[in-house]
Amino acid sequence: MGTQKPRLLFYFLHLLGVGHVYRARRLIEAFAAEGLAVDVVYGGVPLEGVSFAAESVHYLPPVRAADATYKKMLTGNFEELSADYMENRKKALLSAFDGLEPDAIITEAFPFGRRVVRNEIDALFKAAAKRPNAPLIVSSVRDILQGNRKPGRREEMRDWIRDRFDHVMVHADPDVISLGETFPLVSDIEEKLTYTGFVVPPAQDKTIIEQHDVIVSSGGGMFGGELMAIALQLANSDLSRSWCLSTGPNLSRASASTLRDNAASHVTIVEYLDGLAEHMKHAKISISQCGYNTSMDALAAHEASDCRAVFVPHDTTGQTEQLRRAALLQKAGYGICVPQSELTTERLRNAVQQAQQLPKISRAIDFNGAANSASFLRQWIESRGESTATKT
């Protein structure tokens, strides 16, 4: 490898929500800080204003989910996916790979998700295997997998890992959530798993910060309208505390306008809170959905402050990921779970009261997932290089 930086090809896409993009960006920043050169292959719809600490970014013809059921996939222009369109994606991916010399290929979520791109990933791996110094193949996966899989899908995932991957980075602390909670075949791939810790944004210096007693957030806001409306009803009646509702940029303009028009004077409505975890640390209660990124912010706030969490997992479109995560976090004592399908003002009021009584959990949580991932990758690449040198 000489004096050249180890090089990574990081393949990812988001199909609907934006959480995957921001987690990928945090990982890429950590890889760059570790001295790894990163080439990004971006397979989803590009997000305005989002950049990466990468040497290059290669955009494929985008794929997106039609809705939150993820049962139908569309092009970036909301058109039906065709065989020709997917073939063009594959050609674009292989063309990008032809100009790169990665020491490792990382696929975010795949093969535990993103099945729609399995053919192009298969082609990429076959092309990589033909190279004299074939790159390591690494999967990057979050803590919880989506349930309700069709028969045979888990076995398919397992076989991909056993046959095609060298390592799986699980971005979780196994003392809090382990992959086996949602992947029953985990024992078949145990030797390839490495738990990195949770991936969270770096702590920000927020010495001057507008403080609120209760913060309500819903990630990007695409599925947060109901939570925001019910939270506002509770907030308006709670005159003893200041509230802040962070709607997310994807809540409809009409819904956001209605919230602002009906908010009492002690309730602040914003589109986005920069450094959400830091804001939570100055609050007494966090009410949020339970996507990966937001739940990690809530855990970090629990560890560093007196903030307590109410999780309102999105569960109304057949998705199980948030509900399972929220249930596990409630079981561990990190919050109170009220599924969105059961949400009422009274249920939310009771959950806030229950959350206030939660004791602080003394267990230290590993939040160094990004830096640890970078360190593991460097070690694996260097070990592969030493092994190759020995053989030659």
Explain the meaning of each model-derived region.
Residues 275-324:
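A donor-sugar binding/catalytic signature common to diverse glycosyltransferases
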Residues 3-17, 107-109:
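Nucleotide-activated donor-dependent transferases that construct or modify glycoconjugates
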Residues 28, 198-285, 323, 341-342, ...:
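Donor-nucleotide binding loops and adjacent catalytic segments primarily
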Residues 350-392:
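C-terminal amphipathic helix plus adjacent low-complexity
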Residues 140-225, 246-253:
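A nucleotide-sugar donor-handling region in carbohydrate enzymes
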Residues 75-118:
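Conserved nucleotide-sugar donor-binding subdomain of glycosyltransferases
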